[in-house]
Amino acid sequence: MVQPAPTTGTDVRTAVAARGLVKVYGRGDAAVRALDEVDVDFAAGRFTAIMGPSGSGKSTLMHCLAGLDSADAGEVHIGRTELTALSDRELTRVRRDRIGFVFQSFNLLPALTAEQNVLLGLELAGRAPDRAWFDAVVDRLGLRDRLRHKPSELSGGQQQRVACARALVGRPDVVFADEPTGNLDSRSGAEVLDFLRTSVRDLGQTVIMVTHDPVAASHADRVVLLADGRVAGELVRPTADTVLAALKHLGDI
């Protein structure tokens, strides 16, 4: 059963929150209200999926939450930091130091080894890696024997695992995953989803994922449902069947 989404205030257990979020593309008669007064919280240490029909605003919401796009109105908070009040320089620092990203495309540099790709963000930020944490992430992902390999020597699933390790190695407050299994076969996709699940359960990570796949969403603790730029409800402890039923109710299928 689809439950109404809560609209409680930001607290220490909330990793990410949006309040009154509005995003409009275009002007005049051609204007599209991609986000329409969105209020939503994402709990720390949980795996949340964002789903909805095509054009529902799910990717726009994630981009605004992650500071990749600016909202026209409303607030976004990462912990107690209001992203919408930051300068461009401050926002860049937050994205670099407190947010991890996993995209559909792996975005690995072909000339670097897997280990160099994992550590690249820290190197660019001038931060020394925590080798114990690096080892824990690499071992959880099963990359120990692949660290000296370049992307061309890795399968798609292995490349996405490298991308996951890169997102986690800096101990971010939250990892945003945008269709992380979109370029993978079903087996490799399942491996990546299992790791995201494990990173929450065993490493205490917070993961927010946009996906169109009910099976992928079933790995999450919670699914936030969007329709026409608004939060339409949520599912707790989702299964592929309950997600599919919710999407049918929203008119996606």
Regions found by a protein language model. Give the residues of each.
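Short coil-to-helix segment of the ABC ATPase nucleotide-binding domain corresponding to the Q-loop/switch region
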Residues: 112-120
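Conserved ABC ATPase signature
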Residues: 150-160
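ABC ATPase NBD coupling module
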Residues: 27-32, 83-100, 124, 241-245
